[in-house]
C-alpha cells in the first residue's frame, strides 16, 4: 500500500499509462459522428440519428399507437410518423432509413398555456425530448374547445408560433 506523502511533487497514485494514448484515437471518432448523431445513437447506422431535412411535396401522416404494426406500413407512401405512445428507437431508425420523419405528439391543457412561463418551459421540455430521441419535430394535437378571442385563443396562437420557432431553431428542418 502506498504511503501518504504530504510534501513534494511526487504522485501518490501513478496515472495509468494507456489512458493518454486512447484519447487521440477516440477524438477523431467522436468528431466523425455526423451532425445530430451522438455516441448513444440507437441505430446501426449513426447517420440515421440525424434529423430529416428534405421537404416532400405532400405529406402523408401516420399516427402510431404502439406495438410493432409499423413494420407492416407501406413506407413508400409515408412522410411522417407521429408517436402517440411510448418512444420506439427501432421505429425511429426504420422510419429514417425509409426517409420518413418521426415526430412527438404535443398535447397540453389549454388552460395551462395562458401562462407564458409554463408555455416556454413546456416547449423547452418537448425540444429536449425530441433531440434526445433523435426525432424530427412535433405535431401539436390540441383537441380542446377554445373560444374565439379568448385568452386561450391567443395563448394557443402563441404556443404554435413559439413551438415552431423553437423547434426550427434547435432541430434544423424540423416540423
Curated annotation (Swiss-Prot):
Q: Record's PROSITE patterns?
A: GH18_1 (PS01095), GH18_2 (PS51910)
**Where does it reside?**
Lysosome
Where the record annotates domain GH18, the positions are: 39-175
Name the record gives this protein: Di-N-acetylchitobiase
Which UniProt keyword terms apply here? Answer: Glycoprotein, Glycosidase, Hydrolase, Lysosome, Signal
Q: Which GO terms fall under biological process for this protein?
A: chitin catabolic process; oligosaccharide catabolic process
InterPro entries per record: GH18_Domain-Containing (IPR051887), Glyco_hydro18_cat (IPR001223), Glyco_hydro_18_chit_AS (IPR001579), Glycoside_hydrolase_SF (IPR017853)
Q: Which gene encodes it?
A: CTBS
Give its E.C. classification number: 3.2.1.-
Amino acid at each position: 500500500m502506498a504511503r501518504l506523502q504530504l510534501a513534494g511533487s511526487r504522485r501518490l497514485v501513478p496515472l495509468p499509462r494507456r489512458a493518454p494514448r486512447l484519447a487521440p484515437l477516440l477524438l477523431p471518432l467522436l468528431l466523425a459522428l455526423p451532425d445530430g448523431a451522438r455516441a448513444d445513437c440507437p441505430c446501426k447506422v449513426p447517420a440515421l440519428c440525424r434529423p430529416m431535412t428534405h421537404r416532400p411535396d405532400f405529406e402523408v401522416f401516420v399516427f402510431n399507437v404502439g406495438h410493432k404494426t409499423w413494420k407492416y406500413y407501406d413506407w413508400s407512401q409515408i412522410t411522417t410518423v407521429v408517436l402517440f405512445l411510448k418512444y420506439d428507437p427501432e421505429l425511429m431508425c426504420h422510419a429514417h432509413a425509409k426517409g420518413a420523419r418521426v415526430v412527438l405528439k404535443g398535447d397540453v391543457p389549454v388552460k395551462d398555456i395562458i401562462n407564458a412561463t409554463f408555455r416556454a418551459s413546456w416547449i423547452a421540455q418537448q425540444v429536449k425530448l425530441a433531440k434526445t430521441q433523435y426525432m424530427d419535430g412535433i405535431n401539436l394535437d390540441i383537441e380542446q374547445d377554445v373560444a374565439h378571442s379568448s385568452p386561450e385563443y391567443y395563448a394557443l396562437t402563441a404556443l404554435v408560433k413559439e413551438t415552431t420557432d423553437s423547434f426550427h431553431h434547435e432541430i434544423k428542418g424540423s416540423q
